[in-house]
Design a protein with these regions (language model features):
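Cysteine-nucleophile amide-bond enzymes
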Residues: 1-174
């Protein structure tokens, strides 16, 4: 299909624009990565008050302080500042990064009650296995359209199981 390369380019341009910092964002309380690292266990969910244009759109649509979620997986390798968190990013897809990336963000930690250490590790390993998947921008757009009155909604986009948005990443990890 000849439109596919054009749509792919448009998606990359849109993702790059959405990933830019939101000049109006004010962080109420920045995270301390070292304190977080002492507190976190594999499988913990991090709610993030993001600082990008995309984050502003998500917060407006959801009427929430939190625009993003990620999962703490523990150090992926033995290097200092090794990636310890996995997220689905609008520009880069499912990726690993260090807690240091959240230094300028307000973060809240959520932990599933009743999971054993083995179950928490399984959640983390399941998320690590999805590294490299693309971001499902169409799914994100579909969720945004759900906020519109019924008569203003265009036809549905299909959800791509080979791609993820941050919330589906969390859901898949805990199934």
């Amino acid at each position: 299909m000849m439109l596919e390369p054009l749509l792919s380019s448009l998606q990359r341009i849109t993702a790059a624009w959405l990933s830019q910092p939101d000049p109006g964002h004010v962080c109420p309380r920045a995270a301390d990565p070292r304190a977080l690292e002492r507190l976190l266990e594999p499988g913990d969910v991090l709610l993030v008050d993001g600082d990008t244009r995309f984050a502003r759109i998500v917060k407006t649509m959801t009427r929430s302080t939190w625009s993003h979620v990620a999962i703490y997986v523990g150090p992926i390798n033995a290097e200092p500042d090794a990636p310890t968190v996995v997220e689905a990013d609008v520009k880069d897809g499912v990726r690993a990064l260090s807690l240091e990336q959240f230094r300028a963000c307000h973060v809240r930690v959520m932990r599933a009650v009743g999971l054993s250490a083995v179950e928490r590790r399984a959640v983390a390993d399941g998320v690590i296995a999805r590294l490299g998947q693309g971001y499902d921008l169409r799914h994100a757009i579909r969720l945004g359209r759900a906020q519109l009155p019924m008569r203003q909604r265009p036809t549905e986009f299909a959800v791509d199981p080979q791609r993820a948005i941050c919330s589906t990443q969390i859901g898949r990890a805990h199934v």
